[in-house]
Amino acid sequence: MGHFTFISLCLMPIFLSLSGAECYTCPIDWLSRNGLCYKLFDDTKTWPDAEIFCRKHKPGCHLTSIHSEAESADLAEYIYDYLKSEKNVWIGLNDPQKERIWEWTDRSSTNYTSWNEGEPNNSWNKEYCVHLLASQGYLKWNDTPCESLFAFICRCQF
């Protein structure tokens, strides 16, 4: 009995620490990376409609934010592999106040950027939403009118 009690007491902290750990599983057709789930949607929407679509999946879902070169490369590969045609893809970066202050819809940090050369340029004073450029392998960003129709990628934590 003493041996069982000793082992039980030794293992108890392990079980208690695991009970607070969050387990996540992305739906089958979503990309899983670092505790987050990404899903590319091939149908085209305006930027606001794409953001609304993402939010309807689950509280906390948004058009994707991108925070590192590694995350950018993973997403570019995923998009390249699954998009049926060479379409630009909306991400969650925008300029909601139209003051050239870029914000992610999930309110995360904007310390990483990957603008295409010469961007953001706010051409014709109406480019307030951001997409991944198909012509740049989905690695570079461009500001464009929010009413443009593009494919889009959502990011969620399930």
Swiss-Prot record:
Keyword entries, A-Z: Calcium, Disulfide bond, Glycoprotein, Lectin, Metal-binding, Secreted, Signal
C-type lectin domain span: 33-155
Known glycosylation sites: N111, N121
Gene3D superfamilies: Mannose-Binding Protein A, subunit A (3.10.100.10)
Gene Ontology molecular function, alphabetical: carbohydrate binding; metal ion binding
GO annotation, cellular component aspect: extracellular region
Ranges that cross the membrane: none
Motif (Mannose-binding): 119-121
Keyword Nucleotide-binding: no
Similarity section: Belongs to the true venom lectin family.
Reported function: Mannose-binding lectin which recognizes specific carbohydrate structures and agglutinates a variety of animal cells by binding to cell-surface glycoproteins and glycolipids. May be a calcium-dependent lectin.
PANTHER family noted in UniProt: MANNOSE, PHOSPHOLIPASE, LECTIN RECEPTOR RELATED (PTHR22803)
Name assigned to this protein: C-type lectin
Organism: Micrurus corallinus
